[in-house]
A protein has these predicted regions:
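Low-complexity, flexible helical/coil segments
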Residues: 54-57, 84, 101-106, 123-130
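Metal-assisted phosphate- and nucleotidyl-transfer catalytic regions
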Residues: 30-33, 108-177
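Context-gated lysine
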Residues: 13, 23, 39, 55, ...
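Hydrophobic face of alpha-helices
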Residues: 4, 8, 103-110
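Class II aminoacyl-tRNA synthetase-like tRNA-binding/catalytic domains
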Residues: 1-96
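Extended, domain-scale alpha-helical bundle/helix-rich regions
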Residues: 94-102, 107, 148-150
């Protein structure tokens, strides 16, 4: 609850407008993603796998938008890092200079969220013996090509021409970082 509440309050205070995207849609929002098909009265519909389409429309109207809600991914996974349904905290900003504007917003939100968790969830944090991270002014980031290269140099397995990280690379880079 605190995470979703802090997300909403932080973005609202920073000029974002909340949108409520539909969860039953006539087509997928992301090309290539597997989506859950359902019968919707006399036609076929799908469970939304992303609010992306609606966020982009919202940016054209409001400039900055966010959405909190369930998303559904009909992708077969065999990892503990993926699930088929989760609550997505999504935001979209228009008229930015670079991806760094988005990263600055994310860092500021993470700091705010951690403050809120410390204030509102002391009991739970102590019960779970959880220590929250300290967020600095920047978060280390590397380019995809650099991630592939680091993995290749250390394992000799070559994914350098792939458009995304493999599950092996994700695991390795988590430990590496």
């Amino acid at each position: 609850e605190t995470i979703a509440d802090s997300f909403a309050s932080f973005l609202y205070k920073n000029g974002f407008t909340r949108i409520f995207s539909p969860k039953i849609v006539l087509a997928g929002a992301e090309g290539g993603a597997n989506i859950f098909q359902i019968k919707y009265f006399d036609r076929i519909a799908y469970l939304a796998q992303s609010p992306q389409f609606y966020k982009q429309y919202g940016v054209g109207i409001f400039g900055r938008v966010y959405d909190i809600g369930p998303v559904f991914r009909a992708e077969k996974h065999n990892t503990s890092r993926h699930i088929n349904e989760y609550i997505s905290l999504d935001f979209e900003m228009g008229f930015i200079d670079s991806y760094e504007d988005i990263m600055k917003t994310e860092i500021a939100y993470l700091k705010y969220m951690i403050e809120q968790l410390k204030e509102r969830n002391t009991f739970e944090l102590e019960l779970l013996e959880t220590r929250l991270p300290i967020i600095g002014e920047t978060i280390p980031a590397i380019k995809l090509s650099e991630a592939h290269q680091i993995y290749f140099e250390n394992t000799k397995k070559d994914f350098r021409n792939e458009p995304d990280l493999s599950p092996e690379e994700e695991k390795y880079l988590t430990i590496w970082s």
